Amino acid sequence: MRIPAHAVCTAIRDDIVTGVFQPGARLTEELLARRYGVSRVPVREALRTLESEGFVTTRRHAGACVAEPTQQEAADLLELRMLVEPLAAARAARRRTDAHLKVLRGLVRLGQERARQGQGEDLRALGGWFHETLSQASGSPGLISLLTQLRHKVAWMYAVQAPARPAESWAEHGAIVDAVARGDAERARALTAAHAERAGEAHRMRLRSGGPVRTSQPAVNMSSGLH
């Protein structure tokens, strides 16, 4: 059975995001085909997609390599996500379905439970699912696509961690869901913007304490994204 290029693309992207392939690393079709058990055709298609997304660059005489983001690109990326996510929340308040609301509330319950138990690994995944579902609830394909790509890139460029105060973070998630459930677009926007700003401030504090971003430059002080 032929494995589709989008599945290979997801696998390569995941390996880039998690640091299996470091910035600047060569990505040969032969190596990737062997790693994922596929032919070189879907690998070639996947690399083209990842290049269009900014995860891969093509170098003369070297071929495809993992991109090497600059400090400014990493900072701009986080700021862009902080601007776009409140818009998605406002649209979610107007367009969400009962199914979206059920999933969001379920994630908040799980997140609050895991926060009490101190299960950081689970919280990272749950936070990602929460923000993914919130963007899906916006009903805006362009926003959904943009935020999905931004989340991938934030996770790639920054050493994404669970929030320092998980109970507070998940209380904020719960308040956002309440606003979405009531159809209060402006409150959903404001709460999401405040949530993003607090996450951004926590990020800036970690910048000063020295967590590295995945770039080709040494000693870059950057760390996590939004939660």
Language model features: what each stretch is:
Residues L77, D98-A159, W170-A179, R187-E197:
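Conserved amphipathic alpha-helical segments that form helical-bundle/coiled-coil interaction surfaces
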Residues M1-A90, R94, R204-H227:
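Short linear motifs at protein or domain termini
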Residues A93-R94, G139, A162-P163:
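Short helix-capping/hinge motifs at transmembrane helix termini and TM-loop junctions
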Residues E51-T57, H152, A164-A167:
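Mobile beta-alpha loop/short-helix "lid" or hinge segments that flank ligand
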Residues D15, G19, P141, L150-M157, ...:
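A short secondary-structure junction motif
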Residues M1, A5, R81, T97-H100, ...:
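Generic alpha-helical segment signature
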Residues R35, P163-H227:
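C-terminal regulatory/effector modules of DNA-binding transcriptional regulators
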Residues V20, F55, Q119, D184-A185:
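Residue-level recognition of short, well-ordered coil/turn positions
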